[in-house]
């Protein structure tokens, strides 16, 4: 949801990746990024 909902890019910075990373951090993961519209958290 975070990747599709916030698919915005400003000066090369993807806002959706920041939202995805925050989502993953909230789940006690080490961050994450969007891959083909899906938020993928790092372990």
From Swiss-Prot:
Disulfide bonds join 3-34, 20-39, 24-41. The keyword Glycoprotein does not apply. One of its GO terms (biological process) is humoral immune response. GO terms for cellular component: extracellular space. The keyword Ribonucleoprotein does not apply. Hemolymph. SMART domains: Knot1. SUPFAM superfamilies: Scorpion toxin-like. Its main location: secreted. Pfam families: Defensin_2 (PF01097). InterPro entries: Defensin_insect (IPR017982), Defensin_invertebrate/fungal (IPR001542), Scorpion_toxin-like (IPR003614), Scorpion_toxin-like_sf (IPR036574). It is found in: Secreted. Keywords: Antibiotic, Antimicrobial, Defensin, Disulfide bond, Immunity, Innate immunity, Secreted. PANTHER family: DEFENSIN (PTHR13645:SF0). Shows potent antibacterial activity against Gram-positive bacteria. Belongs to the invertebrate defensin family. Type 1 subfamily. This is Holotricin-1. It comes from Holotrichia diomphalia (Korean black chafer). The lineage of its organism: Eukaryota, Metazoa, Ecdysozoa, Arthropoda, Hexapoda.
């Amino acid at each position: 949801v975070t990747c599709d909902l916030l698919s915005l890019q400003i000066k090369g910075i993807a806002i959706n990746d920041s939202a995805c990373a925050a989502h993953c951090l909230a789940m006690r993961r080490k961050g994450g990024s969007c891959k083909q519209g899906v938020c993928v958290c790092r372990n």
